[in-house]
Amino acid sequence: MANYKVEDIRNIVLCGHGGAGKTTLADTILNATGLVKRPASVDEGTSICDFDEEEKAHKYTIESSVIHFDHAGKRFNVIDTPGYPDFIGQTIGALWGVDNAAIVINAQAGIEVNTRRVFAEAKKAGLGRMIILNKMDGDNIDLPKLLEMIKDVFGAECVPLNVPLGIGAAFKGVASTLNPPADTADAVIDPKSIHENLIETIVTADEAVMEKYLEGTMPSDAELSSLMIKAVYEGTLIPIFCVSTKTKTGLTELLDGLAMCAIPPTMIERKAQNAAGEEVTLSPDPAGPLCAQVFKTRVDPFVQKLSFIRVYSGTLKAGVQLSASTARRGIKIAQIFEMQANETNPVEDAIPGDIVAVAKLEELETCAVIGDLQMDRFPFPTPMVGLAAAPKSRGDEAKLSGALAKVTQEDPTFLCERNEQTKQLVITGMSELHLQVIRERLKRRDKVELDTKEPKIAYRETIQAKSEGMYRHKKQSGGAGQFGEVHIRMYPFPEGTDPEAFASNKEMFPSMKAFHYEPSNNFLWIDAIVGGVIPSNFFPAIEKGFKDRMEKGVIAGCKVQDVAVELFHGKYHDVDSNEHAFKTAGSMAFKTVFLQAKPGLLEPIVKLEVTVPMANVGDINSDLPNRRGRPMSMESAGGGMQTIVAEVPLAEVLTYNRTLASMTGGQGSYGIEFLRYDVVPGNIQQQIIASAELAEEEE
């Protein structure tokens, strides 16, 4: 059993923008608490938390990493996360596995794009939030201006719990604003000037204490300590700490502050669903029913698959048969590990609040719930940047499949699927950098190299007019021949049209006998044969001919959709007619009539949501017409950000991430969601058809 209680656990994620010093802070804490004897350095490739080979090569965090330490009677589980938005999936998973978020800000750089993003995500996850101003030993820091900006962007709840004594090279310590020292001569900001605001912010967490305070009675230290955690929990206080991880100045005070302010697992109310679908509140009781969730998966070359788990209720034990939401049968955990970055330490069990890992359980996936309850999946963002990928060596195709399966397990923001229309394997991630790192990992870990290029757009073909025609397939080469004749009418069949109502229109189809509707491509075919001119046993072959041609396309090699076909006449031969003949006749009749029915191309239209600083709204709106975009709405996203919603052809936003980064200096984000297919303008249509014809000739 653990030698600490649930109420003594403090789970914190370190998050923020890249270069803020999160990993260095985690490494420094391990060194300061005596768990690691040697100093660690990200730049020198000796970081404890950045142990992955790609992290060492790039000198920044790519994977979240779990460490633990004890301080001031508290058990800390801390998760270091990537700072670049390209790897936001790792941060999202970590946020939903903890109770507190410490947003680390580079005091020299101020609030950056991912600072805003993770702050909003931490609020969405219902976490207690704290801000750590790092690199206080740096040059050109305007602390009053930075604090004012933090309040403007994140709210008046952001109040310093300490202020620096000196700044830049003169930074030599911090002074408490909760208990200001008598001598504050070296303080950059007088802590006494913040003290009253801090106390008022804290006491608002309890009406009775606040009333006494307003009447002149100062709360006791015990009351302040208790109310501070409550205020952080309720979001009415977001404490700010000053530190330099490089010199370790302010580090002890930071750890003391985290022990004093961070929320324990006993305070956050977690919800789950029972077998009946009813909502239940989880109790962080070691004796309660087990409920734990996987928030991260890592494929380790030594211990194979590692599943990182947060326990919410009950006690997780090894050697016990357990149920899991992603396993068909029960699972049995062989060993439970306490993690120190990439080091594993076996433990007997895990209580509520514990963050542990288990190995070699293929059935467990990220977001899987262990126990008999269900919990919601984490809100991972949808990846937007896709590349068509193929192994450089044809002999690596089988190996590539397994390698990509590993990446898909590890990274919820990576997708891999084969587009049946374009015949391309498309890998999709958060950015080009994200996909580049994945390619590097595949090369190192799995010995598979990839060639990538911009993916093809899955255009569709359709018609805009009614047409009628026939095709006779006749072949005689000695012996039994082939004969089949098919007469059809073709109609535009817009998406949303009721197939039964359409086929039952007696004015259009007076001889309709039956109809068949295929929703996948919105295709309706109608049997209107009179007098048995084609035996009904050949109808499936004719329909197969239609469908094969629709799959292959007619004008540009794209799938056909939104078409209705009426089979109204034909001929057959007692000897030479067979299924193959009528399948061919059906396919060629479809092609012939399609070409007469004003054929055209459809393209996927997506909803584009772009969130940018107010200063960039004009740039975004000016750029949309160049992408054939149609603005739909605009609303405030908070923190000086605006969200613009528009409808845009997918073909126009394949590389939008580059444009957006250029226009906003990396401060913008976007998402796309498929809406519908729409007609491609004529001039663009001709270019697409010409490219398809050229590609066919080259093949």
Language model regions located:
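Structural and coupling elements of P-loop NTPases
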Residues: M1-E699
